[in-house]
């Protein structure tokens, strides 16, 4: 079975867009791949974090993973910082990376402009990401537009290391995630933009742990147009097209089926059906989350993941040390 790796940062805020574009995809893939799913807490500290909130968010994200249907018997679930070999391998890769290629990363350029005193971690973030991937010899990595450049760098670093020291790493291939196809969920108030937790207007963003009445209200207030035709046309009708995408994502119906279902019906009727289906899905997730969050299931899953990943990562780290000439 081919091996795949994916992870999310523990921001404390998971949107419905994150669920459809990332977590749901993990669930769909868990019978197709040997999946490594991690909480990227070391990546999170490239910007300031409150320590208590960070730890709480880590546990919350694991609980959400499980509540959304990620099966710990089919996936290896772990916390990045609980495997010290990620940092060790990252340093060895940093010494085979160049300042120029790191400083050209689009995310670094964007984020460094927003912070007067940014950390070195913001610059070397992509090398740690490369370590996360290469340490497990994964075959595939799901990526959206914002991370595609980082995966290309990981492939470059792996190829460079292999050429310099001999065959060490498998070169991973990208899987284009839902972020790049029709299931990119947009902001309910500004449907030309991706649904994002950082949006100024929170009325356009649905959160997985949000009050269900609030979610329903946001969907019923979503921006549409004056035509009153439920037709998928993202250029001319971005608002209603976004709602069609949302409805399709939770019902598994095609756009054509949805257009036929709501032919002759007004937007209010359509929005109510969208809200009903979304609330049903998120309500089920929340019910499971509330049972899991304070249970010992989380620690059992993480203990198992830590044990498995540390053994694999240790072997790769020792191999790298030997090839480089470190130690005795």
PLM region descriptions:
Residues 99-103, 135-142, 248-258:
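Short helix-capping/linker segments at secondary-structure and domain boundaries
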Residues 8-10, 41-43, 139-140, 199, ...:
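Short, histidine-centered active-site or binding-site loop motifs used for metal coordination
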Residues 107-161, 165, 187:
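Internal, conserved structured core segments that host functional sites
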Residues 50-51, 140-144, 168, 230:
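Short, polar/flexible loop-turn hinges at active-site or ligand-entry regions and domain interfaces
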Residues 18, 149, 155-328:
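Conserved nucleotide- and phosphate/pyrophosphate-binding catalytic cores
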Residues 76-79, 142, 227:
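Short catalytic-loop micro-motif centered on adjacent basic/acidic residues
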């Amino acid at each position: 079975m081919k091996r795949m790796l994916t992870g999310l940062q523990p921001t404390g805020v998971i949107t419905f867009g994150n669920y459809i574009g990332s977590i749901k995809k993990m669930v769909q893939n868990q019978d197709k791949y040997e999946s490594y799913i991690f909480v990227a807490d070391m990546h999170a500290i490239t910007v300031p974090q409150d320590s208590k909130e960070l730890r709480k968010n880590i546990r919350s994200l694991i609980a959400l993973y499980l509540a959304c249907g990620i099966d710990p018997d089919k996936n290896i679930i772990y916390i990045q910082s609980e495997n010290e070999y990620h940092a060790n391998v990252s340093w060895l890769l940093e010494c085979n990376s160049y300042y120029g290629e790191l400083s050209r990363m689009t995310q670094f350029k964007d984020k460094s402009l927003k912070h007067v005193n940014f950390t070195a971690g913001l610059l070397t973030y992509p090398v740690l990401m490369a370590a996360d991937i290469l340490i497990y010899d994964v075959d595939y990595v799901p990526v959206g537009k914002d991370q595609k450049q980082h995966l290309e760098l990981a492939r470059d670093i792996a190829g460079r290391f292999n050429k310099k020291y001999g065959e060490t790493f498998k070169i991973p291939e990208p899987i284009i995630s839902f972020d790049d196809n029709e299931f990119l969920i947009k902001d309910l108030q500004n449907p030309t933009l991706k649904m994002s937790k950082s949006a100024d207007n929170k009325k356009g963003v649905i959160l997985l742990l949000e009050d269900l009445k609030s979610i329903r209200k946001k969907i019923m207030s979503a921006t549409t147009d004056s035509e009153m035709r439920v037709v998928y046309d993202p250029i001319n009708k971005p608002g209603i097209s976004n709602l069609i995408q949302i409805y399709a994502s939770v019902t598994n119906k095609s756009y054509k089926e949805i257009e036929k279902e709501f032919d002759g019906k007004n937007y209010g009727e359509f929005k109510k059906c969208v809200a009903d289906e979304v609330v049903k899905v998120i309500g089920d997730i929340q019910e499971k989350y509330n049972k899991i969050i304070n249970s010992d299931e989380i620690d059992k899953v993480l203990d198992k993941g830590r044990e498995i990943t540390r053994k694999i990562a240790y072997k790769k780290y020792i191999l790298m040390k030997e090839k480089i000439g470190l130690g005795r």
